[in-house]
């Protein structure tokens, strides 16, 4: 386990990402409204989402809306410590409990007493520690390693994972009884690609925050750069966006972030179990991304090129049948035939003059 908020200065005690409560997408607004309802309770919360979607941010928001807001918020990464140290870090240890234990130390549960303990990557906990965690949640007391004395605690537990715990239960890697104990309230965070309305508000937040840290003046972002950010799929979610903006601010000039300043990854992450992946791979989304690449190339006569490509593709899809092609595109056969001749897909019939359709357009595309 690792305490996620390590800087000694209170001003730096949380990451910029962990304070970015600037959501405008309808999905995020609905989630925030739900948080308003569940935060005042003492119920355990299980937060599910891909890496970098803002699970710690949601946990902090719940804490700040609760009656524990003036008490400690402790964030712990359950996968950051070896199995031999997990118990001592979570529950504490007495002097001499193991080699190197030169003094007694309180665990994270004791440190969070009266407040909130956020257990990130809960699915990484070893099974033996899951048993002890379940007992702590049930009895509301901890026993330090090397001690027999129970220490009462008053802690609200929020947990998060980026894996499907139901599958982990079936595979024997996670306890079912612990799952139900943690999953009183279930919050599922959508990936950033499924809430595009958050991209630019988060971008502006990161620009402002990092500009202050770097000692910069006012930094703006060009429309072209905004368009590039909106068109990217963000496999690393909010964490990736934060890193991109941080890097961009280091290399941009004249206080304006331009399209070419943005360095976006070419990495494609396949998520066969992701229910949201199909929406991003819809024909409309694929077509829009293709248009964006054409726009970035700044090629001339785009309208005509798109028309020609559409007609050629439809003609081949219809097995070179003019009538079917015209029907598929919603055009007259004469217009279809004339354009097929123009793009070289159909030979001119010299015995029959081609209709003069000089002023007629194939299709009106708004791109």
From Swiss-Prot:
The keyword Hydrolase does not apply. One of its GO terms (biological process) is regulation of DNA-templated transcription. Gene3D superfamilies: 1.10.8.60, Homeodomain-like, P-loop containing nucleotide triphosphate hydrolases. Keywords: Activator, ATP-binding, DNA-binding, Nucleotide-binding, Transcription, Transcription regulation. One of its GO terms (molecular function) is DNA binding. It comes from the Bacteria. Residues 21-250 form the Sigma-54 factor interaction domain. Involved in the dimethyl sulfide degradation pathway. Activates the expression of sfnG and sfnF. This is Sigma54-dependent transcriptional regulator SfnR. It comes from Pseudomonas fluorescens (strain Pf0-1). The gene is sfnR.
